[in-house]
Amino acid sequence: MIEIPTGLPAELVPLSWLLGVWEGTGVVEYAVGDDVVRREFGQRISFSHDGLPHLNYSSYAWVEGDDGPVPFVTETGYWRLRRRVTDGDPGPAMLPPTGERPFTTADEVETLRNADGGFDVEVALVHPGGVSELYVGQVKSARIDLATDAVLRTEGAKAYTGATRLYGLVERDLLWAWDIAALGQPLRTHASGRVSHVD
């Protein structure tokens, strides 16, 4: 059973099953040139909110070294229902809202439900290696399907052109899979993991 925290903005209810801290393991397997890189890793994922209609997201992964855990990769970003921003939303930048805050009740959020019975979502992620991704997709029950709508790379970033991600709640664990198009290759399997709720 998914518990909805008191004070959660109504727009976040479809994503509320993600809230909290998750820890577990995963594996990356991807061809780099003539070699296939295969590595197991530990992972800590956090979804939180600060009263605004988006989830704060961070993921940190490590590999086991001879002297203990060694930092591997990290990413951070924001998850929200996909809708048009209104005068009731802050921004751009630090500009305050000029109207009433939208979608504050369950009935108002229901108007955002799509024809498939889910809710459209967008996810903005930033990687410290010079890559930013904008994903679009949908959340339906306890499953999220995402595909990149845009990828932005700095001049020094590695070749990376697109991705898909799948998240699902299975037996109270969060399972995920991430396919990428990178290093001159088409979209293919890249990494997956299983994390358990720890906080």
From Swiss-Prot:
Catalyzed reaction equations: peroxynitrite = nitrate
Species for this entry: Clavibacter michiganensis subsp. michiganensis (strain NCPPB 382)
Keywords: Heme, Iron, Isomerase, Metal-binding
Classification via CDD domains: lipocalin_heme-bd-THAP4-like
Binding-site residues for heme b, renumbered to this chain: H190
Pfam families tied to this protein: THAP4_heme-bd (PF08768)
Protein name: Peroxynitrite isomerase
Annotated S-S bridges: none
Alphabetized HAMAP family for the sequence: nitrobindin
Function field: Heme-binding protein able to scavenge peroxynitrite and to protect free L-tyrosine against peroxynitrite-mediated nitration, by acting as a peroxynitrite isomerase that converts peroxynitrite to nitrate. Therefore, this protein likely plays a role in peroxynitrite sensing and in the detoxification of reactive nitrogen and oxygen species (RNS and ROS, respectively). Is able to bind nitric oxide (NO) in vitro, but may act as a sensor of peroxynitrite levels in vivo.
Top-level EC class as recorded in UniProt: isomerase
